[in-house]
A protein has these predicted regions:
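Juxtamembrane/interface alpha-helical elements of multi-pass membrane proteins
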Residues: 2-71
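A generic structural signal for ordered alpha-helices
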Residues: 6-20, 24, 31-35, 74, ...
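Glycine- and small-hydrophobic-enriched helix-loop-helix hairpins
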Residues: 35, 45-109, 113-119
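Membrane-interface, cytosolic juxtamembrane amphipathic helix immediately N-terminal to a transmembrane helix
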Residues: 104-144
């Protein structure tokens, strides 16, 4: 009886590990989508109103910040990047670090071009992650 209970416990831990790993892989894609949406929102605000970044973020929808894993919905780009860092690979993290560092500096046209560059770069990375997602999900399920 104890052997059966032990076997069931080991099996349930494996299933739980696989479930958590698959959710993590899907969350990686969701976080990238959240950052793309946030940069699109910031770009639109810069294009229409040319507000400072703090004013843009204070007027943003909380769902934008939640998608980027913002701690307690703080409209603070460095804090959001730090909170979402666990879900970002090296390229995406480097791209977003550059975005956080460069946004708000320069003229309107320059900021719009930089936003377009970061959106394009993140979309390319998102496509790469989305293409690898089924393989990574199968790998997580197989290993666990």
């Amino acid at each position: 009886m104890l052997k059966l209970l032990g076997a069931l416990l080991i099996l349930s831990v494996g299933v739980f590990s696989a479930f958590v790993s698959v959710q993590y892989e899907k969350k990686r894609l969701t976080v990238i989508d959240g950052w793309i949406d946030l940069i699109l929102y910031i770009r639109g605000q810069i294009d229409c109103y040319l507000l400072p970044i703090d004013d843009i973020l204070s007027g943003g929808d909380r769902a934008l910040f939640e998608a980027c894993m913002s701690p307690s919905n703080a409209a603070d780009l460095p804090a959001m990047l730090e909170a979402s860092g666990i879900y970002l690979d090296g390229d995406a993290k480097h791209t977003l670090e550059s975005f956080v560092r460069e946004i708000g500096a320069g003229y309107r046209e320059e900021q719009l071009k930089r936003c377009d560059f970061f959106i394009s770069s993140l979309r390319n990375q998102r496509e790469r992650i989305a293409a690898a997602l089924p393989m990574r999900v199968r790998l997580c399920a197989t290993l666990c």
